[in-house]
């Protein structure tokens, strides 16, 4: 997802994201969203705190996992609802992890709380993206000098410190991953895709499996 180059402050671009099961088996779903401003930071410092230069309008059923570091980081990006368990998150996309990358991009990891049946579809993860209206065009101060012809010339102008975003390119990359809804498949695929520490991964995946009634196979229980 890449808005047009003439994207302006306060302008909203529609982008509805959901995942449909077009296969013939039940599936579990996770999504990785990568945001980046080419040449600029994702966040800007406003008078009342940190804000995102691109404001994502999330779907109605989006929450953050109430884990250390996740819920606090999710609030400034507009995800204020939190859940302690997938069992408390019916038909909900749950933000499980946030990673800040060296190139200035940011990765957001979401797991859909339920199992998507054949021909079923998740709720909307997001609906649109708006360029923060605080990014204003124009000049904040000007200096003029007489030009010798009875008029004046503009000799110095200080641009708004946020103007540079208008010349930067925002990109959102969305990678959805689906897996057959079995204990082993979810453990393997989600374990690799979530890119979490082993301890955090165990908490998230085990909670998801328990919330969806997926018990460890008897053969594994015996090990």
Predicted feature locations:
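Surface-exposed, hydrophilic segments of mature proteins
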Residues: 1-223
């Amino acid at each position: 997802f890449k808005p047009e180059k003439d994207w302006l402050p306060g302008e909203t671009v529609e982008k509805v994201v959901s995942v449909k099961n077009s296969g013939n088996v039940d599936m579990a779903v996770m999504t990785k969203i990568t945001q980046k401003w080419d040449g600029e930071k994702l966040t800007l410092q406003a008078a009342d705190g940190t804000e995102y230069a691109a404001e994502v309008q999330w779907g109605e059923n989006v929450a953050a996992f109430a884990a250390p570091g996740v819920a606090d980081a999710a609030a400034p990006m507009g995800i204020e609802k939190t859940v302690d368990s997938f069992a408390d998150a019916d038909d909900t996309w749950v933000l499980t992890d946030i990673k800040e990358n060296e190139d200035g991009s940011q990765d957001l990891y979401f797991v859909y709380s339920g199992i998507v049946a054949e021909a079923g579809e998740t709720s909307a993860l997001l609906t649109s993206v708006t360029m923060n209206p605080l990014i204003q065009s124009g000049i904040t101060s000007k200096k003029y000098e007489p030009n010798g012809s009875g008029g004046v010339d503009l000799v110095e102008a200080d641009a708004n410190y946020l103007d540079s975003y208008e010349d930067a390119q925002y990109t959102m990359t969305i990678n959805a991953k689906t897996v057959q809804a079995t204990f082993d498949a979810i453990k393997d695929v989600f374990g690799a895709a979530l890119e979490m520490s082993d301890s955090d991964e165990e908490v998230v995946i085990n909670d998801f499996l328990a919330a969806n009634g997926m018990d460890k196979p008897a053969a594994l229980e015996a090990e």
